[in-house]
Amino acid sequence: MFLGGAVLLILCVLPAGMSRSAWLAAGGACLCVYAWHMDWADKFRLLWQQQRLRVVMAMIGGLCILLLVSHLLFVLKPDSARGRLFMWKITCRAITEKPLTGHGIHNFAAVYGNAQEAYFAAGDYESWEERVAGSPEYAFNEYLQAAVEWGVPLTLCGLAAIVICLYIGIKKRRYGICGAILSLMIFSFSSYPLQLPVFIVTFIALLLACVCGNSRWEWIGLAILAVAVGGFRLKNDLRIEQACREWMNVRVLYNAGAYESGEREYVSLYPLLKERAAFLFEYGHGLHKLRRAEASNRIMREALKLSCDPMILNIMGKNYQQKGDYLAAEECFIRSTHRLPGRIYPYYLLAKLYAEPAFRQPDKFETMKRIVLTKEPKVQSTAIRQMREEVNKMIVKR
């Protein structure tokens, strides 16, 4: 009864979520658990010996069905699928830069941003790639992200350890636990579950449940270890949680434009939240609004190590422009256009920069003006209309 209710709830929730990754993970894991329980491997070996031709035909038919399902999942949300494929393409380019050692933990976003910037700067790309490109925090593929951060050898070692745990679990006939691990592994191919602490803890617990015996002392030892690790992290985690609560309150001042009042709060929260790109961006942007260009750029450079958002480069460029360092401002704005060429805003900033009396460049201004007026945005908005109206009124004499 309980099992039937759980299955019914899953069937209700999965379609509503419109998550193709979740559908594949649930379907694939359930199929494997059923196959293990029904001893499909032994039956397959027997059929292969007796009716090899039928098995081959069935495999070809299954492959055709799989291709059809893949096509249907693609056309369900085509731009989303293309976006994932493009993300993985850029991630693979980042992996080739440091395949053995990786770029370091928590460095994915910055590395991805640099790789995407270099790719678009080369100019050899398709129009659909410009349309679907974004500034992701994660690779939407845990295996590729691990290869970027840890390097390929360490990633393969981690995968080997997981496979060994699964093998032991199957030998011990712990099919439900192995199915849960498998579903998480399938889901990890096109999402980012292991970037969330709850999934990491769950994954480790499932792996331990695969390999541990039935001894009470083993489980007591694991429980003591879990409590010790949790207790060790508890104090710092509580401090960060409290800092995040205070940050949410300070955001009210930031969104209201009270940058002077908010700046004092950002200074006090900085030691605890300096590893969060969103916090650093707000802090640096507030300093920019207060016309404290040097301090703003110092914070923005830190944010650039944690994020691939081109708005960071835009703010840095505006800070340089405030200081009169027009060449540095131009470099930042051009980098922003390469990082996400589909955005109109950095072209608008370049047009305004080339119209500056101290940095007047009529030819470049006309090029940027034409791009701002003719480039098709992803979504039409009031901001784009206002930018176009402003640029259209600007005249730079030769």
Where are these regions (language model features)?
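Single-residue signature of alpha-solenoid repeat helices
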Residues: 262, 296, 329, 364-365
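Helix-loop-helix junctions and helix-breaking kinks within/between transmembrane helices
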Residues: 4-38, 70-74, 151-152, 189-198
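Hydrophobic alpha-helical transmembrane segments in integral membrane proteins
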Residues: 69-86, 227-257
